[in-house]
Amino acid sequence: MIELCLLGATGSIGSQVLDLIREKRDVYRLAAFSFGHNINKALDIIEEFEPDLVCAIEELDAKRIKETFPKVEVTFGNKGLQQVATHNCLCPKVINALVGSVGLTPTLSAIEVGRDVYLANKETLVIGGELVMAKAKENNVKIIPIDSEHSAIFQLLNGNDINEVKRIIITASGGSFRDKTRDELEHVTKEDALNHPNWNMGSKITIDSATMMNKGFELIEAHYLFDLPMEKISYIMHKESIIHSLVEFYDGSVFAQMATSDMRLPIKYALEYPSHSYTEMVEPLDLVKVGCLHFNELSLDRFPMLEYAIEAINKGNIYPTILNAANEVAVGLFLEDRIKFLDIEKIVKEALDNPIYEKFTTGELTIPKIMSVDELVRIQILTKYR
């Protein structure tokens, strides 16, 4: 029996992990999980899966759970996330499906106790990729990607020599506004942005997909996950989201990973790596039904957030933290109807260009530095826009 420690059980990825557990109850058990603010869904999960440990973000929610399920160990807050990541159980696998920079610390906690991490939390590598991969190597643990694009690359590289790779190509659906002009973006709404053409995802990542910051994050993730220089990482628009990534080798061969747009497939592959065992959860790919696949260039003029992400990783050090914190706050403000869609780009660019952060750009990158800058960026933006 494999016992899962699931960070972010009530979100989009977490819910799909639970689908996998339901399909294979003889293989997996949910030993511990965390959740954000969906207390009712968390209570349902406890009722169904009977975990040992539950972490709430809010103390009041933790108290309610303890009153309802007195035999369950309950914790809360950031320290609670670390407890979930290090929970003592049989054959543990830690799945990080959190959203935002809050995912970094529990990832490091899991690594430090020698646990492989199954990673859906993009921000872990965006802001702390250098530290995370170094710690993983030091502790001889694996970071297995759950993101569909990185899962595809992970599969395509398996059994191949990384030194023979000319480049990897990450595909992008283009998001909710891929067919709109810059002028048309002036008038789009939150509801428009949340209507993704291909994927069923959480609200934050759906907005990131619309701005193309999601793809920028994926470039940074790939840089760290596969230890490739940025010049070997490229991108292309592929509206159908059938090809999830490609790998081109120096002999001219190009390998592509294809599947339907269902996150349960990369989740399943990550947890069962390197197996491709049978499942009824995912609809088989029917290429005749798909008919045609289309590819287009991704313009940095049309999608400047992609350029900002490339700028941040090229500058290195604390700049990816600035990028991520500014984006998290800006997306939050947009979802609260406090700013317009194009203001997200404006806020991120202002943060990257703000000279107040220059004093943090020298010296070693550390967790305290990341956390300090993350907090400062958030304060600066919220002071101006709230």
Spans of model-derived segments:
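Catalytic, metal-anchored helix/loop core of enzyme active sites in primary metabolism
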Residues: M1-R386
